[in-house]
A protein has these predicted regions:
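A short alpha-helix-loop-beta-strand transition element characteristic
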Residues: 228-236
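ATP-dependent adenylate-handling active sites, centered on carboxylate activation for C-N bond formation
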Residues: 1-226, 240-255, 263-339
């Protein structure tokens, strides 16, 4: 992973790192800071043009991510920018976000909106490339629902499914949210050499057993580079970490605009992947305004999910059967602030 970060820092434009304060982005930021002093392009033989890494985080005022990111930035010595947004700013951006991300997937839109707002501010600072932590949760089973995996085989098969679909979800979010403002996002966890090694590990080494946290193997490998509170921080999905009230307000906003009668007619208005929540219906309506063809609707993945699971993983636990919310807080008994 260190080599992957080193390779991906090769750039002739100002760059930075996205730092949510979660384990994955913190590892990438810490590694990037170790290589920041010299130019990668000439095998580290001359001083870098931008010798100090700039890190970026976004959240509602007082959000968990902003506090955690500041802790990491102080520890690794990055020039940190903790950006805030309001719920109203997020709501105002939804139409543009859905246009740029080209999706009506609920969790993608929830997470893409603050990232889109962050990209706008990063662009204004002159940064043209950022490193990001996407991929680790898929490779190492970092989502909270992986706690419910019945055995190592099921755990591994789910990671494979998640990686195969990554371009439809998190990678689409990171790439398109940044590209909307002319910023390139690079993802070291998905470096081919690293991915080959990580997926060759025994699934039992990744399995979450009593006394372990998700991605324990990553936590142990990089514990000496991170503050202890970050190395032991529970997984927060990006849409949760920016502030729990963000998702709550999105759901409330949609409930005010979508009636029960609308939901009763959803399968007729949207015969392809009909939405099953008012929030999903609201996003789908905006998507249809931008992309009215049925073929566009068919390009968007669909299916029930708990905490970003694939539909196949819903069979792991009886508590998943009635769940249809992709937030990590939907995993009862695991998330500290579960619904």
């Amino acid at each position: 992973l260190s080599d992957a970060v080193h390779r991906q820092l090769m750039s002739d434009v100002p760059y930075g790192v996205l730092l949510s304060g979660g384990l994955d982005s913190s590892i990438i930021a810490a590694l990037a800071c170790t290589y920041a002093a010299n130019r990668i392009e000439d095998d580290d033989s001359s001083p870098a043009w931008w010798p100090q890494i700039h890190s970026f985080a976004i959240g509602l005022d007082g959000s968990p991510d902003l506090a955690a990111a500041k802790t990491v930035a102080d520890h690794i010595g990055s020039v940190h920018h903790g950006l805030t947004f309001t719920v109203q700013e997020g709501l105002d951006a939804l139409r543009d976000v859905i246009y740029h991300i080209e999706t009506y997937d609920v969790t993608t839109i929830r997470a893409s909106t603050p990232m889109y707002l962050m990209a706008r501010k990063i662009k204004a600072m002159g940064i043209k490339m950022v490193l990001s932590g996407e991929g680790a949760d898929e490779i190492f089973g970092g989502y909270l629902y992986f706690h419910k995996a019945p055995n190592a085989r099921e755990f591994h098969e789910e990671t494979v499914r998640k990686i195969e679909r990554l371009h439809l979800f998190d990678c689409a979010r990171a790439n398109k949210s940044m590209a909307a403002w002319g910023i390139e996002a690079r993802v070291p966890f998905l470096d081919l050499e690293f991915l080959d090694i990580a997926m060759s590990l025994s699934p039992s080494a990744k399995l979450i057993t009593p006394g372990k946290l998700e991605k324990q193997i990553l936590r142990d490998a990089f514990a000496d580079m991170l503050p202890e509170s970050i190395a032991k921080r529970q997984k927060e999905q990006f849409s949760d970490g920016v502030g729990y009230s963000w998702i709550d307000q999105l759901r409330a906003h949609a409930a005010e605009r979508v009636t029960d009668a609308d939901m009763n007619r959803a399968q007729f208005r949207f015969p392809v992947n009909p939405p099953d929540t008012k929030e999903g219906y609201f996003y789908r309506s905006i998507f249809e305004e931008h992309f009215p063809s049925e073929s566009a609707a068919r390009c968007v993945p669909s299916g029930k999910s708990v905490a970003c699971s694939t539909p196949e993983a819903l069979a792991w636990d009886a508590s998943f059967e009635g769940g249809a919310d992709p937030s990590g807080r939907a995993v009862k008994g695991i998330h500290a602030d579960a619904y």
